[in-house]
Amino acid sequence: LGIAFAGTWFAHKYPERRAQMRLLFDAALSAQTPDNRFDIYSRFLGREERYQFPEPYASHVVGSLDYDRMLSAYRSYKVFLNVNTVTTSPSMMARRVLELVACGTPVVSTPAPSLSRFLGDGIIQVSEPAQAEEAVRALVADPDLRARLVHRGQRELWRAHTYAHRVDTVLSSLGIDHEPTRLPSASVIVSTVRPHRLDHLLDRVAAQRDVDLELLVATHGFEAPDLVARARERGLDRITVVPMPTEAALGDCLNALVERALGEVCSKMDDDDWYGPDYLADLLRAMRYAEADVVGKHCRFVHLAARDLTVLVQEPNEHRYTDFVAGPTLTARREVLRAIPFLSVSRGEDTTFLSRAVDARLRVYAADRFNFVQERSGRPEDHTWTEDDEVFLRGGTPCPPLAWDPERP
């Protein structure tokens, strides 16, 4: 389905609201296509005439839904429209907007300061007819734009606008001591055989924000006596370096890091991949809302360096429970990794862990595709997984250069 609005027409009051509706509705009528029609759900359908939508909008009224069915309808549309009865308040806004974003549906709205405060750039605000039509057309046509917009909005929701956050506010206002809602602490664990990749790794970890983290690095077959100092230059004060002998298996290196980890969650990173600044916080939020034991990314961007090409792989496999996440994104509760340690192998240690976790009936969740790019150098010796580029090309969608930037969104 295409474009939708849900609400009420007031013929007898709120003239500014009616003007906003005409602005957005006319844009929707211009932007709709046979496959992406404009639908209106009228809250007061069949009641007094003053609540009925006039033409040319009345012919687009498709019914009225109760609350539960309306929540299901939210997920069915590419774009939802929103207007604001109160346009100057920094706090008043329709709960519907937050519900839509939580359901994964982009919202185009007329402006209100509350929208920017609650959702940042995770919602599109328009005030002119051409601007409104352009926004609706773009969202209907571009699934990547829809996904990025929703992801930015959802990040704000999970960061500060769940019911748990509101309970925190109430308890704090009443002066009641309580444990506030927070993300779990994290231990980033990295085993590397490449001294020349350490600066890249430190830069990626140091860029993480909104996370209480420590870094644990296994230097596999080499010493890095200045690594702690280099980390602290970047603001990484909590770092543990564990030298491991060359003959140690990768699984043993990772287990050694998990045993030393202090974080509630351990997140495995690779030294050559690209992790955006919101990467880890997004995964920890996904772990919380999905009530998962293990999270990571299945759908993801992969940069094929030998071809200078980036592809999006496993596109349907995000925002769902699964039995697989990519090894460089594997993030699990510390007690899970201690109960199900990595096998003493140097290949497949992550996939065997996932298989055993699923067998133990633990919940594995594949989060969104964003803030991560898997780097494939084109040299098999650089990777523990030796599949060639053709594997990714066969199952991937080529992306324009900016689409895979880990800094976006």
Language-model-detected regions and their locations in the chain:
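A charged, aromatic-enriched C-terminal amphipathic alpha-helix characteristic of glycosyltransferases
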Residues: 144-174
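A recurrent flexible, glycine/aromatic-enriched loop bordering the glycosyltransferase active site
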Residues: 302, 313-332
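Short, acidic, metal-binding catalytic loop of nucleotide-sugar glycosyltransferases
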Residues: 203-212
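Conserved donor NDP-sugar-binding/catalytic core segment of glycosyltransferases
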Residues: 278-309
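C-terminal catalytic/acceptor-binding lobe
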Residues: 151, 340-409
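Active-site nucleotide-sugar/metal-binding loop of Leloir-type enzymes
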Residues: 254-265
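Nucleotide-sugar donor-binding catalytic core of glycosyltransferases
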Residues: 1-98, 103-115, 120
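Short beta-strand-to-loop acidic/aromatic patch adjacent to the donor-nucleotide binding site
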Residues: 263-274
